[in-house]
């Protein structure tokens, strides 16, 4: 009888251990970079960053640069990262978007004032069910799991608007117009292989001779 009880206890222990291991989060690693810094997503869902940090892009609560990878604060179970703007962005496994950093100033760098709050990841509660984000300077796009695309200004991230006329989108990409830091354009790929573009059309960025609509 004692052996039977011990056997049951051991079997139960093994099952519980298996369940714990099965629930351990795992995601596909990725890296995103711009001219100043890099974000790396590990398979365990943590985010690591290195490079210039004067705008808080590393997400460590300070403006201290880092020669070596440091872990971004407060993020777990992340599935996507984006480092294209001075604002860094990430998407977690629940589909929420996180952002941190400060917009690049047109004034001299020595006048930049960065708070710990700006340099620490914050969640955007106005949108969820997101699977991918992209940014180019001030503006950002979020692709939801239902194939719709949403836009927001990084200065007011809780004011999220749906991009009309798009559905069944599988990939999004934003670009900055060469020679004008305030002009942007966006592209989207739908499930049928069609490419959609909008925004500024300087130098025919949208692949058409027609004027675009500024973001």
Regions found by a protein language model. Give the residues of each.
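Sec-dependent signal peptide recognition
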Residues: 3-8
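Sec-dependent signal peptide cleavage junction
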Residues: 15-27
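Beta-strand-rich domains and repeat architectures in extracellular enzymes and scaffolds
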Residues: 27-41
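Short loop/turn segments that connect beta-strands within the blades of beta-propeller domains
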Residues: 34-35, 43, 52-54, 84-86, ...
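Conserved core positions of repeat-based scaffolds
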Residues: 37-40, 49, 87-90, 99, ...
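Short glycine/serine- and acidic-residue-enriched loop/turn motifs that recur at repeat junctions
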Residues: 41, 48-68, 98-124, 150-164, ...
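Short glycine-/Asp-/Thr-/Trp-enriched loop segments that recur within the blades
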Residues: 81, 178-181
């Amino acid at each position: 009888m004692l052996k039977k009880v011990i056997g049951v206890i051991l079997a139960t222990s093994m099952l519980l251990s298996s369940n714990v291991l099965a629930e351990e989060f795992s995601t596909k690693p990725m890296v995103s970079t711009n001219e100043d810094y890099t974000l790396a997503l590990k398979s365990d869902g943590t985010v690591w960053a290195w490079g210039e940090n004067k705008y808080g892009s590393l997400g460590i609560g300070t403006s201290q640069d880092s020669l070596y990878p440091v872990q971004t604060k407060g993020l777990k179970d992340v599935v996507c990262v984006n480092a294209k703007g001075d604002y860094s962005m990430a998407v977690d496994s629940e589909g929420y978007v996180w952002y941190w950093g400060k917009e690049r100033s047109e004034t001299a760098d020595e006048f930049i004032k960065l708070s710990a709050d700006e340099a620490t990841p914050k969640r955007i509660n106005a949108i969820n069910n997101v699977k991918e984000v992209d940014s180019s300077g001030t503006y950002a796009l979020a692709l939801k799991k239902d194939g719709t695309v949403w836009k927001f200004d990084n200065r007011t991230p809780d004011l999220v608007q749906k991009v009309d006329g798009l559905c069944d989108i599988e990939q999004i990409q934003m670009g900055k117009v060469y020679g004008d830091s305030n002009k942007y354009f966006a592209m989207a790929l739908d499930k049928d292989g069609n490419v959609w573009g909008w925004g500024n059309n300087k130098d025919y960025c949208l692949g058409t001779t027609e004027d675009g609509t500024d973001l």
